[in-house]
């Protein structure tokens, strides 16, 4: 379905109909456009009916000009040309839906089925361990790379803005800008997260592919949250067949701490930077995902959650400090990077953090960077296991 973009108005000047830009469209140096009687009719239909399909417009033209059905194919061709011209000029927009016929790759990450469209060389090799085949009906999210700039820049209301991204809300979609990622023009996502379109440069340079990989994470975490899965900024290891997460502010030493576990106790690494959690059959689980910061450490497997160790710095000693129940919930939520663009999303994050704190160990370890730090944490975890 095609809809009129905001920022254009139909005006008649000395008997001639013009589409004239205003506001941001003038700032973007958009030009006016002359319309004949038929084009004026089509614009009015689009504007006053909140959108229409090409065939619907062709049939309306046939009725208006008293043409029989044999003329509809030719009318449809003319209507399509008109819509394409206005779309390319940014005066109308098409409802977000896949343009490509067949997906380039299909992948399953934490049980979420994603069909991806676009040049395969633009998708990071980190996705390859997650490639799976599944039916179209099982698709949770479609993601399409369009290797050209968007036809228009009408962004909407700002929800969030920082140096990494700006998120705008429109009636039917979110629009995201990534100012630090020069190869990504912008991205559009339906409000339910089921379809994402990323406008990007076609060059498959290493940094370009890395930028796209990082951008795709945002849209994955959006749909994951809707499926009850939440991401915590943390490094993880496998101990006693359970995933243990170590989390702290940047520079707090989570990578150093998991490295000590790996070296001292032979604990396998799971993920070096990000862990996705959810509930399955009444049990909290940690799911393998490809995003792992710069560590290069990730797994495709899933494990029961053992608990979370929140790390703090002490220059001389290693010891555990008891946290109040509310503080456990708050600190776990603060380590989440699942979307909190709107109040509802914040509430979902808070609810899940409370579920973790109510049912799993959440330890607060003040520690050095010495081997004794890992030993202190291990002793505490072993004592917890003995009590169960």
PLM features: residue spans?
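Conserved glycine(s) of the Walker
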Residues: 252-254
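Hydrophobic positions on the alpha1 helix immediately C-terminal to the Walker A/P-loop
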Residues: 257
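Short, well-structured alpha-helical segments that form the helix of a local strand-helix-strand
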Residues: 57-61
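A structural micro-motif at secondary-structure boundaries
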Residues: 27-33
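A noncatalytic interaction/capping subdomain that flanks phosphate/NTP-handling catalytic cores
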Residues: 3-26, 39, 62, 66-76, ...
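Short capping segments at the starts of secondary-structure elements
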Residues: 45-56
